[in-house]
């Protein structure tokens, strides 16, 4: 494979033959804004292009604008940034339609419990259209896995924080596999070798380079080895948002030498380039054999040298020629139907939950221990006057603290949300499918978590006999579990920080618990805030009422009717039955799930706003949160 890039290409011949994508950007400026530091230019008048069949590497020191350039031309610029300039596809203003492009992020956000084969197969079922049979989708997945050199590790689990799995290089190749199943013509990769050793980096980049045929590939990369650098066709070298060099990667060494900064013998050229233009550690750099200049002076010399070179003129000429062409429009490809996506996601999520010990199994074990402790504490509570308080305390603990412990699954919720956000951003499926799948897959486990510990605590305590009473108790507990999980999923989708999410979720539940009507009876609650509206908003009120009515109605303790105990001791509203309380809880569950869906949809705006508020510098912007239609701007 040669990395020599011709100065010009006859587009009229190439475009019809391979249907490739020519991407150009001209006089591209990007400005980032922050509350603390105001506005700052991140990209400053960049011009360049990417062509089919070639790998363009965007290089530069940290903070040079590599990822910002990649995000801008990929249409993923963050909400706290503004851009100007032209970005054209095949010489036209058009959007990057689904299936025509793919973006591989720097982080490998994958489900750790799945095998490589499962991850790619499920992704194929989600992305590829219903018009394709299951065997055809499987064949595409197998070919993709083989193309990335993963056929020998297909049955190995990916692994993560919950257990050991495949290597970092293999994870990166899996991430790439998931994005090229639709055979996109344009592939963006953000730091594909980040965190990998030199050998793994080479094999990952070699696999990427092997995908170049008929495809335009653009990758931001920090410090490639000599072997990795040899795989690049074109090089875009940035420093402080300005172009230092754009042209054939093989000609970069000559350019630096002609500019007065030759690469020393036996030194990695990319190391020399980055060391020369890195202004973060300003130092005197040798020019020729005698003179020394500061880094800023060197950068200015290189930029002026580039603008006066044939390479600069070739770029301007090539961009102008591409822009004059009437290339093909990118058609949006179809993917699996909403029902298919919901079913596939449900199946995938169910398997993930079954294998992730921290999702439900560990919580089930803890719940069983607590239920045994609760049952032994209130064992055979009896019918004495003291049993009124004992029954109430036991039911309150079940409805409040057992459900409160759903925050234990928050780490798994966060991992789910990360995977969802990556897949949604890349167009694999929509928010509705995810919320439905999350709800359906969680129900069997939460039912199990409600029934087993609930039965232990219920029968050890000696609460009301009768199958109906226990079923109602379990239904209320199950519904409360679902409500709390919905609440925690809402928090996980809104709060970008793990610790903040735990604190926020626990804080919200604590306020609801305090206003539920047990720690202070309903009539004693302060009316502002605690009773109106919090008492009526908290699900604890209806859980307490339902469980207490289920237990005390029809019960006699020392010749006192259970109804009188409910009315006078617990100050329960007896104008409606316990089934109304259950219906209200079910309504709240539906409301919370709908709210979860709305928050997920609005998260593209809310989450970047939170990040922008928390950031201290425009350099900390995360540009992959909200895609903007930059091609229509």
From Swiss-Prot:
All copies of domain ABC transporter, residue ranges: 23-265
Localisation: Cell membrane
Spans traversing the lipid bilayer: 364-384, 394-414, 440-460, 470-490, 498-518, 580-600
Any one GO molecular-function label of the UniProt entry: ABC-type transporter activity
Name by which UniProt lists this protein: ABC transporter G family member 1
One of the protein's GO biological processes: green leaf volatile biosynthetic process
Gene3D superfamilies: P-loop containing nucleotide triphosphate hydrolases
UniProt-listed SUPFAM superfamilies: P-loop containing nucleoside triphosphate hydrolases (SSF52540)
InterPro entries: AAA+_ATPase, ABC2_TM, ABC_transporter-like_ATP-bd, ABC_transporter-like_CS, ABCG_dom, P-loop_NTPase, Plant_ABCG
Ranges of residues in domain ABC transmembrane type-2: 340-552
Phenotype upon loss of function: Disturbed release of volatile organic compounds (VOCs) in flowers, including benzoides and phenylpropanoids, which accumulate to toxic levels in the plasma membrane.
Biological role stated in the UniProt entry: ABC transporter controlling the release of volatile organic compounds (VOCs), including floral volatile benzenoids and phenylpropanoids (FVBP), in flowers of fragrant cultivars (e.g. cv. Mitchell and cv. V26). This scent, mostly produced in the evening and night by the petals, attracts the pollinators (e.g. the night-active hawkmoth pollinator Manduca sexta).
Membrane topology, record value: Multi-pass membrane protein
Assembly behavior: Homodimer.
UniProt keyword Membrane, yes or no: yes
Binding site for ATP: 60-67
SMART domains tied to this protein: AAA (SM00382)
Keyword Transmembrane: yes
Induction statement: In fragrant cultivars (e.g. cv. Mitchell and cv. V26), increases before the onset of volatile emission at the end of the light period, peaks at night and decreases when volatile emission declines early morning; this precise regulation is tuned by ODO1 binding and activation of its promoter.
Organism listed in the record: Petunia hybrida (Petunia)
UniProt KW keywords: ATP-binding, Cell membrane, Glycoprotein, Membrane, Nucleotide-binding, Transmembrane, Transmembrane helix, Transport
Superkingdom per UniProt: Eukaryota
Residue positions the entry lists as glycosylated: 352
Tissues of expression: Restricted to the petals, with the highest expression in the limb and, to a lesser extent, in petal tubes, probably in both epidermal and mesophyll cell layers.
Pfam family, one: ABC2_membrane
């Amino acid at each position: 494979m040669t990395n020599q890039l011709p100065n010009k290409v006859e587009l009229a011949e190439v475009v019809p033959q391979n249907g490739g994508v020519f991407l150009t950007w001209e006089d591209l400026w990007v400005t980032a804004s922050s509350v603390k530091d105001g506005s700052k230019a991140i990209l400053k008048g960049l011009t360049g292009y990417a062509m089919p069949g070639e790998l363009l590497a965007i290089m530069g020191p940290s903070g040079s604008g590599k990822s910002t350039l990649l995000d801008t031309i990929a249409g993923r610029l963050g909400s706290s940034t503004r851009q100007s300039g032209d970005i054209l596809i095949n010489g036209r203003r058009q959007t990057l339609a689904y299936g025509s492009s793919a973006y591989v992020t720097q982080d490998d956000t994958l489900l750790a419990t799945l095998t490589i084969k499962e991850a790619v197969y499920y992704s194929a079922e989600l992305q590829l259209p219903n018009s394709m049979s299951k065997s055809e989708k499987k064949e595409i997945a197998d070919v993709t896995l083989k193309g990335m050199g993963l056929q020998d590790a297909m049955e190995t689990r990916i692994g993560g924080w919950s257990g050991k799995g495949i290597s970092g290089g293999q994870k990166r190749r899996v991430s790439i596999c998931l994005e090229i199943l639709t055979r996109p013509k344009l592939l963006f990769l953000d730091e594909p070798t980040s965190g990998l050793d030199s050998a793994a980096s080479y094999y990952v980049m070699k696999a990427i380079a092997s995908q170049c045929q008929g495809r335009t590939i653009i990758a931001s990369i920090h410090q490639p080895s000599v072997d990795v650098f040899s795989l690049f066709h074109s090089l875009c070298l940035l420093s402080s948002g300005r172009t230092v060099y754009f042209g054939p990667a093989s000609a970069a060494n000559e350019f630096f030498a002609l500019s007065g900064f030759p690469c020393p013998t036996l030194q990695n050229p990319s190391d020399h380039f980055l060391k020369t233009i890195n202004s973060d550690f300003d130092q005197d750099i040798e020019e020729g054999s005698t003179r020394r200049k500061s880094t800023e002076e060197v950068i200015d010399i290189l930029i002026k040298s580039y603008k006066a070179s044939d390479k600069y003129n070739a770029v301007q000429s090539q961009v102008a020629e591409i822009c004059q062409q009437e290339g093909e429009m990118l058609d949006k490809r179809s993917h699996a139907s909403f029902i298919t996506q919901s079913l596939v996601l449900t199946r995938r999520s169910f398997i993930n939950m079954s294998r992730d010990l921290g999702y439900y199994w560990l919580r089930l074990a803890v719940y069983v221990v607590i239920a045994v402790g609760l049952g032994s504490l209130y064992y055979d509570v009896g019918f004495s006057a003291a049993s009124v308080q004992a029954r109430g305390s036991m039911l309150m603990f079940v409805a409040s603290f057992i459900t409160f412990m759903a925050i234990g699954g928050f780490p798994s919720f966060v991992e789910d949300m990360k995977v969802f956000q990556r897949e949604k951003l890349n167009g694999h499926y929509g928010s509705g499918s995810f919320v439905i799948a999350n709800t359906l897959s969680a129900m069997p486990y939460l039912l199990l978590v409600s029934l087993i510990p609930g039965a232990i605590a219920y029968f050890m305590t000696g609460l009301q006999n009768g199958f109906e009473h226990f079923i109602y108790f379990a239904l209320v507990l199950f519904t409360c579990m679902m409500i709390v999980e919905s609440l925690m999923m809402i928090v996980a989708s809104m709060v970008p920080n793990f610790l903040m999410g735990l604190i926020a979720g626990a804080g919200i539940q604590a306020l609801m618990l305090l206003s539920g009507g047990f720690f202070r009876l309903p009539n004693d609650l302060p009316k502002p805030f605690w009773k109106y509206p919090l008492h009526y908003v908290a699900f604890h009120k209806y859980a307490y009422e339902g469980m207490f009515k289920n237990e005390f109605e029809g019960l006699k303790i020392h010749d006192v009717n259970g109804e009188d105990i409910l009315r006078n001791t617990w100050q329960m509203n007896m104008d409606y039955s316990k089934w109304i309380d259950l219906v209200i809880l079910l309504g709240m569950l539906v409301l919370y799930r709908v709210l979860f869906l709305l928050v997920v949809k609005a998260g593209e705006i809310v989450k970047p706003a939170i990040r922008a508020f928390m950031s201290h510098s425009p350099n900390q912007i995360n540009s992959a949160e909200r895609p903007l239609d930059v091609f229509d701007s």
